[in-house]
Amino acid sequence: MNAFLSWLLDLLFPPKCMLCGKLMPDAATMVCEKCGYDLPEWEGVPRKIKGYDACSAPFFYEEPIRSAILRFKFHGMQSYAKQFAVWMAARAGEELKGKYDVVTWVPCSRRRRWERGFDQSELLARALARELGAEVCPLLQKHRHNRKQSKIKGAARRRANVQGVYRPLAPGEIRNRRILVVDDIVTTGATMEECGKVLLLHGATQLVCAAIAIARSDQKK
């Protein structure tokens, strides 16, 4: 993009902080200084997800990150993926180093992709892979539409809701691979567990996962 076009876009659509909406001096900076110091950072307390050796996330699922994720998913703010990936890479680059060969994502259904116009977890995975300098590959597909996990209360009901909805997209690409699975949020871990079950069944040797945010224990109910 040439300098004039960049200037014109900034004039017509002035860049704003993705967290509070404050006007920013240029589009290269997506978070204002105040918000940058006021983030709900995850302390890194070990989170056990069945089938995974490690789970990495930079934040708890709290404000202002929560609202930014919702705008990203439901209001077309695809540009947020880059900044989310920068934050995720800063954490995952250390915590998951040497534990994966390829990056993939938790896919949404075709219906959900049509409604939103994109798959938010795919955008995250591709942006994160660029930040980490890693290979990225679609390995799973969601072949059956189900209720939104956010509408279901309780870990057991969430596990039942996702049971059997994923299958391998490219079984040959899974076998003997160490895989980093990306999603936007981890709450009960039911979705990650179901994806992990499919990947391990088809020959994955090690699984780790990463998300933008993770729920506190009292948010998983």
Question: Where are the model-predicted features located?
Answer:
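Glycine-rich phosphate/pyrophosphate-handling loop used in enzymes and phosphotransfer proteins
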Residues: 1-221
